[in-house]
Amino acid sequence: MPPRQQPRRISRELALLSLSQINATPEKLEQIEINNLILAAIRTLTTESQDMLETAASEVTQGNERLLKSETQSANVQSARAMVSEALKLTQGAINRLAHAIELPEMIQLASQYEVREYALELIGAVNRRRTEIDQQLEAVLVDWQLNRLPKIDRDILRIAVAEILFLEIPNKVAINEAIEMAKRYSDDEGYRFINGVLRRFTERLRITNN
């Protein structure tokens, strides 16, 4: 059984995983049921898992081909090992995504479904309505990066955190910590460190602007 989590933490995960699939008007957003959010989230997780497994299979195939050539090209051995290592990481990532998909409905059952739904929809609505403004804020603090070049999951984690700080009156520290936790769960080591740095710069810029 998954551990009981606070409703808002589950809401953030639901919003993160549903953003790409729910683009409703504010009126239609209010009509979305919790089951629709769960379905959208599970679809996102399973799609990501399939993509990861396909990439892993490709890495294994290429690694095997390089091993077959290793008798004449010793450098191929190291390259093949790197490919197999990457394939293992991708496979583990896919397994983790599928585990989250299995856990999600039960996590919501253990929490207050009303609270989970309400805050998830509030987050989705805020991000969708104010996306241009949110993205401008993020572009201003990205160093040597463009927002549209980031992995989608990282972009949406950043958008949710900025929406919470700017429009939902969530304290900076809480929004950043929750974003880092989501990144640890759905991104990678580089991803969560990068997200932490971007949000720290964003809140510092906000502090200077407001003073």
Swiss-Prot record:
Intrachain disulfide bonds: none
Gene: nusB
Similarity section: Belongs to the NusB family.
CDD domains with a match to the protein in the record: Terminator_NusB
Record InterPro entries: NusB-like_sf, NusB_fam, NusB_RsmB_TIM44
Annotated function: Involved in transcription antitermination. Required for transcription of ribosomal RNA (rRNA) genes. Binds specifically to the boxA antiterminator sequence of the ribosomal RNA (rrn) operons.
Keywords of this entry: RNA-binding, Transcription, Transcription antitermination, Transcription regulation
GO CC terms of this entry: cytosol
GO BP terms, alphabetized: DNA-templated transcription termination; transcription antitermination
Domain of life: Bacteria
Pfam families noted in UniProt: NusB
Organism the protein comes from: Rippkaea orientalis (strain PCC 8801 / RF-1) (Cyanothece sp. (strain PCC 8801))
Name of the featured protein: Transcription antitermination protein NusB
An example molecular function term from Gene Ontology annotations: RNA binding
